[in-house]
C-alpha cells in the first residue's frame, strides 16, 4: 500500500498537534487531539483515496514514523497480520515499524458535537505556514481572525 500525498500532508500537520495518533478509524477519518485536550483536528481522507487502513493501530511518535517514511523515495507499506507492525520498503531496503497500544496514547475517542458554525473561512497551507513563520519571528502564539471591512 502507498500513502497518498494528502494523507502524508494531513499526518505532517497533525504531528504539530500531538505526536500520538491512532489510525484505521472507520470512515477514513484521521483525528488528533493536543495533550492538553484543548485542540482537536479531523481530516476525512478516505473518499479521496482508493484504500482502507487494514485495522486500527497506534503510533506513539508520529514524527519518527514520518521520518522513517521519508528515508525512502517511494515507500510501500505492508501491514502485518498480527497487527503489531508495518513493514516499510522500497523494494531493496525494508524495516519494521512497531505500533503502540492505542490505550496509552492521547487520542480523541469521540467527536465533539458543536452547534452550527458562527463563521467559516478557508486557510491554505501556504497561508498557515506564513502565519507560523510570522508567529515564530514575533515570538507570539496568538492569532486573531477578523472580518475585513471595506
What are these regions, as identified by a protein language model?
Residues 1-98, 114-150:
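DNA polymerase processivity clamps
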Amino acid at each position: 500500500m502507498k500513502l497518498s500525498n494528502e494523507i502524508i500532508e494531513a499526518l505532517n500537520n497533525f504531528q504539530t498537534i500531538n505526536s500520538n495518533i491512532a489510525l484505521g478509524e472507520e470512515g477514513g477519518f484521521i483525528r488528533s487531539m493536543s495533550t492538553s485536550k484543548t485542540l482537536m483536528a479531523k481530516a476525512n481522507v478516505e473518499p479521496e483515496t482508493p484504500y482502507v487502513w487494514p485495522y486500527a493501530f497506534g503510533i506513539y511518535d508520529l514524527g519518527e514514523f514520518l521520518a522513517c517514511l521519508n528515508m525512502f523515495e517511494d515507500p510501500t507499506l505492508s501491514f502485518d497480520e498480527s497487527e503489531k507492525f508495518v513493514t516499510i520498503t522500497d523494494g531493496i531496503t525494508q524495516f519494521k515499524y512497531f505500533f503502540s497500544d492505542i490505550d496509552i496514547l492521547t487520542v480523541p475517542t469521540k467527536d465533539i458535537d458543536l452547534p452550527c458554525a458562527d463563521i467559516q473561512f478557508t486557510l491554505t497551507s501556504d497561508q498557515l505556514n506564513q502565519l507560523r513563520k510570522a508567529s515564530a519571528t514575533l515570538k507570539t502564539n496568538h492569532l486573531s481572525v477578523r472580518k475585513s471591512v471595506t
